[in-house]
């Protein structure tokens, strides 16, 4: 990175954070520092940043909220405090996958707005800016007291996989919440056919069902777009409906892939032919999931972000 100020990449805890920090360091031309992480006998987290970092005026901490998310959160807070203690003036959290964002409001009485509490904690710990890749709802970044960046990955992912949007392609949001993603992807790729499915979720049991649809998939190759695949239930439901209603095939784009339990088996049984996701969470061996390196995309946008801090 050009300029008089010196920035450093600080790798976070976990395999996804390690991979992403190495990619950012390579793409941004910045030094990478790898802290020491360990647990005390009572399982309290401990971190130490080795080496002299006092000469750096800024740091980009790469910490994805991989499981358990609470551990990722605590390590991100401890790293920020360690950097402040070392005299680093400006600190950016690059969270490839930002946790706690799905509890963005009170669904049942007595619940917290979890993402608000987390954003406040991160800002209080010393972070001046926060960047992530396709957060669940972009407005949750407003809870963070500082500069924010939400990186849209889907156009880049399609390009990297060599898939184009032809006349027989339809882009589908598995629920109305993902419609803005689909609209933007359609706009940037020139895809004229898109829409969304309407799902209903039982807040107690978590059971999901499709209520209706705004798309006609007959004779189309469907691209389903969502921010995250967790248990695979939503994607499986969408794929099954699309194929039953005449779609030729179902291809999935997801920014993040947790793949909990039998998610892959569930999607395969529902007819999903391929899933393309980002390297924001730990990679899993898979028959249908392909990972796209998003560090090149993130590097360019982070360079602009830090230049304005």
UniProtKB/Swiss-Prot annotation:
It comes from the Archaea. Binds 2 Mg(2+) ions per subunit. Keywords: ATP-binding, Cytoplasm, Kinase, Magnesium, Metal-binding, Nucleotide biosynthesis, Nucleotide-binding, Transferase. Its EC number is 2.7.6.1. Pathway: Metabolic intermediate biosynthesis; 5-phospho-alpha-D-ribose 1-diphosphate biosynthesis; 5-phospho-alpha-D-ribose 1-diphosphate from D-ribose 5-phosphate (route I): step 1/1. The active site is at residue 199. Transmembrane segments: none annotated. Gene3D superfamilies: 3.40.50.2020. One of its GO terms (biological process) is purine nucleotide biosynthetic process. SMART domains: Pribosyltran_N. GO terms for cellular component: cytoplasm; ribose phosphate diphosphokinase complex. Mg(2+) 2 binds at residue 175. It is found in: Cytoplasm. One of its GO terms (molecular function) is ribose phosphate diphosphokinase activity. The keyword Lipoprotein does not apply. Coiled coil: none annotated. Mg(2+) 1 binds at residue 136. D-ribose 5-phosphate binds at residues 201, 226, 230-234. Belongs to the ribose-phosphate pyrophosphokinase family. Class III (archaeal) subfamily. PANTHER family: RIBOSE-PHOSPHATE DIPHOSPHOKINASE FAMILY MEMBER, RIBOSE-PHOSPHATE PYROPHOSPHOKINASE 2. This is Ribose-phosphate pyrophosphokinase. It comes from Aeropyrum pernix (strain ATCC 700893 / DSM 11879 / JCM 9820 / NBRC 100138 / K1). The lineage of its organism: Archaea, Thermoproteota, Thermoprotei, Desulfurococcales, Desulfurococcaceae.
């Amino acid at each position: 990175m050009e300029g008089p100020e010196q920035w450093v990449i600080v790798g976070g805890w976990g395999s996804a954070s390690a991979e992403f920090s190495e990619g950012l360091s390579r793409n941004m031309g910045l030094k990478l520092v790898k802290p020491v992480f360990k647990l005390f006998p009572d399982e309290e987290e401990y971190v130490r940043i080795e080496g002299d970092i006092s000469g750096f005026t800024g740091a980009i901490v790469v910490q994805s909220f991989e499981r358990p998310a609470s551990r990722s959160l605590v390590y991100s807070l401890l790293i920020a405090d360690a950097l402040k203690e070392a005299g680093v003036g400006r600190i950016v959290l690059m969270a490839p996958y930002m946790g706690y964002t799905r509890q963005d409001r009170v669904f049942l009485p007595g619940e917290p707005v979890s993402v608000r509490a987390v954003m406040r904690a991160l800002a209080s710990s010393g972070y001046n800016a926060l960047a992530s890749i396709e957060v669940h709802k972009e407005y949750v970044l407003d809870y963070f007291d500082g500069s924010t960046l939400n990186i849209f990955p889907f156009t880049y992912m399609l390009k990297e996989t060599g898939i184009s949007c032809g006349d027989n392609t339809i882009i589908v949001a598995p629920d109305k919440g993902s419609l803005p993603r689909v609209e933007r992807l359609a706009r940037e790729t020139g895809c004229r056919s898109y829409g969304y499915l309407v799902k209903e979720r039982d807040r107690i049991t978590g059971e999901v069902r499709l209520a209706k649809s705004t798309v006609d998939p007959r004779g189309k190759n469907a691209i389903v777009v969502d921010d995250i695949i967790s248990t695979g239930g939503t994607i499986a439901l969408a794929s099954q409906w699309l194929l039953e209603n005449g779609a030729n095939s179902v291809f999935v784009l997801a920014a993040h892939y947790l793949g909990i339990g039998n998610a892959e088996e569930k999607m395969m049984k529902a007819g999903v032919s391929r899933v393309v996701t980002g390297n924001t969470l730990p990679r899993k061996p898979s028959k249908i999931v392909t990972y796209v390196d998003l560090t090149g995309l993130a590097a360019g946008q982070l360079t602009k972000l830090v230049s304005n801090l």
